[in-house]
Amino acid sequence: MNDSILLGLIGQGLDLSRTPAMHEAEGLAQGRATVYRRIDTLGSRASGQDLKTLLDAALYLGFNGLNITHPYKQAVLPLLDEVSEQATQLGAVNTVVIDANGHTTGHNTDVSGFGRGMEEGLPNAKLDSVVQVGAGGVGNAVAYALVTHGVQKLQVADLDTSRAQALADVINNAVGREAVVGVDARGIEDVIAAADGVVNATPMGMPAHPGTAFDVSCLTKDHWVGDVVYMPIETELLKAARALGCETLDGTRMAIHQAVDAFRLFTGLEPDVSRMRETFLSL
């Protein structure tokens, strides 16, 4: 067996993350013993440690890479030696590659993960006008992926309209055109009704946040509907959309493809997407 791989995930509330299992199983399948540690600043021996201390520890201990999640995706940028152009434009990093010399490079595979998920799950979706509900969390990455995968007009709706507009400004600046506008999520149903598709980028649909982010009665069979939530895989939104005959994109595709792209960056190996999906769905 070749050299082992040591990876980690820095964030808060990591117990349910499926990312470690995907990386460990894929590494082993490719003949590389892989250890992937959860580094939870709320619920582990890393509790209370600042981000720089944890990043330095990973360098000293010979980690090959780190995934970064809430609440550190923005805070990690100034601590890195290099950041990809895309991650710099978004102001968020979720993947840090550490080379043999300890040089750190930040990437954002949330963007590529959602984009690849769209290519795979909604290859023929109409993209003239799309609504994204939710500007927090992975909202920036989802919006960037939508616009760079063909969406002509994207309306990002949030209860905090200033946050929605701030996201729009970031994406418009990154892509060099006025593709995104921030709008109020209150009464968004009329806007959704006139759109080609809608993506839920809020936590609504998770066990801790049951329900939907908008009234699904505005949907018709002509809409396509996406969701970033993957626990459960069939959210209330997707269940309602499928009952209408809508094309749908569940949250597993983004979750799997962001890990696929991160594994490639960490190891230089070509991951087996089907195998990583099988691991994800078995958990």
From Swiss-Prot:
Q: Where does NAD(+) bind?
A: 137-138, 158, 163, 203-206, 213, 228, 251
Any idea what a deletion of this gene does? Cells lacking this gene are unable to grow with quinate and shikimate as substrate but do not affect growth with glucose.
For the keyword Transport, the answer is no
Q: What is its EC number?
A: 1.1.1.-, 1.1.1.24
Family assignment from sequence similarity = Belongs to the shikimate dehydrogenase family.
Could you confirm whether the keyword Cytoplasm appears in this record?
no
- Please give the name of this protein: Quinate/shikimate dehydrogenase (NAD(+))
Example GO CC term: the record gives:
cytosol
Q: What induces it?
A: By shikimate, quinate and QsuR.
Q: Which InterPro entries match?
A: Aminoacid_DH-like_N_sf (IPR046346), NAD(P)-bd_dom_sf (IPR036291), SDH_C (IPR041121), Shikimate_DH-bd_N (IPR013708), Shikimate_DH_fam (IPR022893)
Reaction(s) catalysed (UniProt annotation): L-quinate + NAD(+) = 3-dehydroquinate + NADH + H(+); shikimate + NAD(+) = 3-dehydroshikimate + NADH + H(+)
Tell me one GO molecular function of this protein.
NADP binding
Arranged from A to Z, the UniProt key words for this protein are: Amino-acid biosynthesis, Aromatic amino acid biosynthesis, NAD, Oxidoreductase
Q: How does it assemble?
A: Homodimer.
What NCBIfam families does this protein's entry cite?
A: PRK12549.1, PRK14027.1
Q: In which pathway does it act?
A: Metabolic intermediate biosynthesis; chorismate biosynthesis; chorismate from D-erythrose 4-phosphate and phosphoenolpyruvate: step 4/7; Aromatic compound metabolism; 3,4-dihydroxybenzoate biosynthesis; 3-dehydroquinate from D-quinate (NAD(+) route)
Highest rank taxon of the organism: Bacteria
Q: Which residues bind shikimate?
A: 17, 69, 73, 94, 110, 258
Organism name: Corynebacterium glutamicum (strain R)
Biological process per Gene Ontology, one example term: chorismate biosynthetic process
Chain residues that bind L-quinate: 17-19, 69, 73, 94, 110, 258
